[in-house]
């Protein structure tokens, strides 16, 4: 799954929160997509290339395919449940071919999912 962010500067302490090996909980529903190009396009809509971000997310149990009820069915939209916990597999690094910073996350098993 993928999530593009055009400007991560509004996310407080981003590089500390998403440091490799850390665990982070996303507190609310989060919309992601199975379509990397759609997420990359969203991330690249940001004016400052150094602030463009692409999350690469390995989900296990918390994600549900909602493309069939989504207003944007062609986006292959998937919804991640609130309270999902992730481990940062690789912290922010620049990906020249994609023109974005990449952060890789994997879902941590929890008793809720």
Question: For the regions a protein language model found, what residue spans apply to each?
Answer:
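Conserved NAD+-utilizing ADP-ribose enzyme module
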Residues: 65-113
């Amino acid at each position: 799954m993928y999530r593009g962010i055009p400007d991560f500067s509004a996310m407080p302490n981003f590089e500390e929160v998403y440091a490799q090996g850390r665990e982070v909980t996303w507190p609310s529903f989060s919309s992601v997509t199975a379509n990397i190009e759609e997420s990359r396009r969203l991330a690249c809509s940001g004016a400052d290339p150094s602030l463009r971000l692409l999350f690469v997310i390995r989900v296990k149990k918390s994600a549900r395919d909602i493309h069939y009820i989504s207003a944007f069915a062609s986006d292959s939209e998937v919804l991640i449940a609130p309270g999902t916990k992730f481990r940062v597999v690789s912290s922010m690094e620049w990906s020249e071919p994609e023109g974005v910073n990449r952060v890789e996350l994997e879902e941590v098993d929890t008793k809720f999912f």
